[in-house]
């Protein structure tokens, strides 16, 4: 009898060990696959683009055509609404439209609200699926009291603190930036692009985060400088384009309404796909320029300028 009990115990132990080894092997296979997933947005001249299948999509690494390992409609979204605290206080008059945008998001969208100040992101509301709670975090920007900061360094800070649960192959990440784009911390004199722009773009690409930017002027006379504004809009336009999103501005004046911008961004977020490609990043990992096209009529695909291919074993 004791022998049978010992035999049964050994059997349970071996079965448990096999399950653990199988799970470990599966995890190793997944980690060493070298797959990279990134978000692609379908844009149509019509009100809503048609469903896009994997067969409709062409992916290239430079001039080399690549096979798409997986293509699926985006579901889970982590969306951070980041407001430059140096904005003119009249921006708060647009928050009714921003609240409508927040409340229109599907239940699967986790929303955070933060204010960019002192080269960091002051999180007013962490990621939550309670959209009413997120909407309540909106307040009047500080204006002149926040002049002297860099929205680019502030967003890098936010990306460094992005929740690990959001950085999965099955989740999308987006930032909705409302800013003049002016870097008051670094100032001018660095050529057309601010020194922290490229590090921000690379971090966003590595974390598969699209950065949608909406222009609103800063407080004070310095924020009306033609040179600063022209340079800033060049920077935020590149930021959005290189991270697979779009920038919204019409000249350098005070926008009448931000509602059309929020509505369009909402439509884009509802028409996103996750594209997975198998590609080795070598022993160190690397950034790879990509081009994504479709043969579907009247449809354009928006994708980041480059993606990060993880190193073997990541």
Q: Model segments located where?
A:
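N-terminal secretory signal peptides that target proteins for export/translocation
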Residues: 1-6
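Detector for intrinsically disordered, low-structure N-terminal pre-sequences
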Residues: 7-11, 56
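Bacterial N-terminal signal peptides
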Residues: 11-22
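Scaffold/interface architecture of coatomer-like assemblies
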Residues: 26-314
């Amino acid at each position: 009898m004791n022998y049978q009990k010992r035999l049964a115990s050994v059997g349970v132990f071996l079965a448990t060990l096999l399950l653990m080894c199988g799970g470990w092997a599966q995890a190793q296979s997944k980690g060493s696959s070298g797959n990279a997933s990134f978000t692609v947005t379908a844009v149509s001249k019509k009100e809503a683009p048609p469903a896009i299948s994997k067969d409709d999509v062409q992916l290239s690494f430079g001039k080399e055509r690549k096979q798409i390992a997986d293509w699926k409609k985006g579901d889970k979204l982590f969306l951070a609404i980041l407001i430059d605290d140096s904005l003119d206080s009249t921006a708060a008059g647009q928050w009714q439209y921003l609240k409508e945008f927040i409340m229109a998001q599907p239940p699967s969208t986790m929303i955070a609200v933060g204010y960019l100040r002192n080269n960091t992101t002051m999180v007013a509301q962490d990621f939550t699926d309670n959209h009413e709670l997120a909407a309540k975090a909106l307040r009047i920007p500080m204006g002149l009291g926040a002049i002297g900061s860099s929205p680019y360094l502030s967003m890098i800070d936010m990306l460094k603190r992005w929740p690990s649960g959001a950085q999965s192959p099955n989740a999308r990440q987006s930032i909705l930036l409302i800013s003049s784009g002016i870097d008051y911390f670094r100032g001018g004199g660095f050529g057309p692009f601010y020194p922290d722009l490229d590090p921000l773009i690379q971090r966003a690409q590595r974390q598969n985060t699209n950065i949608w930017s909406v222009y609103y002027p800063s407080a004070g006379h310095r924020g009306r400088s033609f040179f600063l504004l022209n340079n800033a809009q060049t920077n935020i336009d590149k930021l959005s384009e290189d991270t697979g999103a779009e920038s919204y501005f019409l000249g350098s004046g005070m926008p009448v309404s931000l509602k059309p911008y929020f509505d369009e961004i909402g439509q884009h977020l509802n028409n996103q796909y996750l594209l997975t490609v198998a590609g080795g990043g070598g022993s160190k990992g690397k950034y790879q320029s990509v081009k994504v096209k479709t043969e579907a009529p009247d449809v354009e695909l928006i994708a980041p300028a480059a993606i990060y291919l993880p190193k073997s074993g990541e």
